[in-house]
Amino acid sequence: MGVLTDNELLLGGIVGGKRVLQSRVLPLSANELSGLLEFLWQQGVTSVWVLPSSQFSQRATCSWLQQASDQWTPLVHPSPAQPELPTSALFLSRGHEHRLTLAFPAYAGWRWILPDAISLLATATYLDQVLTRHMVESPQQSAHQLLTELTLKEPVSQLRVSPVDLWTLPDREGRPVPLQAETSGPSWMRPLTLEEQRQRYLHKYTYFSRALRACQDVQLGAGTPQLSPQGRAFDGIRPGIWHVHLDRAGSIFNDKQLPGSLNQEWISTPHVVCCRNIGYEVQIQEGYYWPQSHQLLKSWATFLWQAVEQMQNQSHQFRHGQARTNASQTLKQLAEHGIALLREPANAGGWSRPDWWAQIAGRQWALLFADLALLVRRGTMPVLVDGDAFWVVSADPNPFTAVRGLLSTQRWNGFAPGYEVPLFLSKKVQDLFRGKEPVGRVVSTLDNLAEEHTPL
């Protein structure tokens, strides 16, 4: 594996159990595509990542790469967002004895920060190591490939096919059941209390991916969904989608003290169980359930979770901080796009299982509320929750000790500080919690302020 810059080919290897770098100066002939391919073949590399800031990356187009010399047959993969630009190009020698892949992260859609060639080489190396495969395509294509590969041992085609059209599944009155009405988590904030206003710092914490965590144990439906007109078939185990009436009944998950889940009418089995666990009164009015269930996504989700866990727990083997961040972000993207495939229609390349997506979303709610309940028992009340992130105020400037028990474990538990340096609880910050700005805008403002105050 190597990284191509304007002047050199940077190669990574292992000598005596240690990673070493080697540099090869590009010849003048490398200014032409045919000369570059010949040079790379002579170096014995089979995959090369092109540094986004290089002139070669900036002038590369799909049509230009198609004009390789007579010695090579190019297979160019275009970017889904910009079809004229390449995500990768596979070059086969005329006799097919040699294969060479050029990858263009500038156009693939990975959210990588790459200040230099070493950060790109380390990022690609870490991903190869934890995924045991090359990921040179776009996030969508790579996620589809990985999800397919890691579920091969299961009867995927049999489990994926629904005997009925899930998009038109009728309720008692003949209206389509809104399988995609289930949301994956709240965006919520509350005003600061007087005591909180006297604190000095605002900390942000993120969780890697509750959606991926949910996929490790969620039950997914198989077979023909069965109508339960009065909801009496609900048992808290079988996958289902249920029309409910929720009452907070004194629960602190009331959208005032903590985020709530009171405004949803159709929710999945894991979400119903979650609502009862946090003290809601739940009246099930009707619903559908699946008589058979399985955990098709468990092996895929566990593989991705263990990949990021390996990097976090063995940081001495993954020493490049930015590359480790890039690789972790890549694993999260693979999870996001893989889960999104479940509810995409088949004619759009998806699995057409919105019911599976609903079960995962409901399980996400359960995991979030369990985490929030644990924080409260330990004496911490979040002031803002958005997806997998939450914010707290504290007199402690250290993010590793500001929330008791959250980051004290020696092994990675999914949580990480969202801000390297906490925000000072200034009047400007406090005013954000007094105003009427949407939560999303408040989050963006806070993140921008934190970025401005992060040391270089």
Regions found by a protein language model. Give the residues of each.
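Conserved acidic
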Residues: 2-456
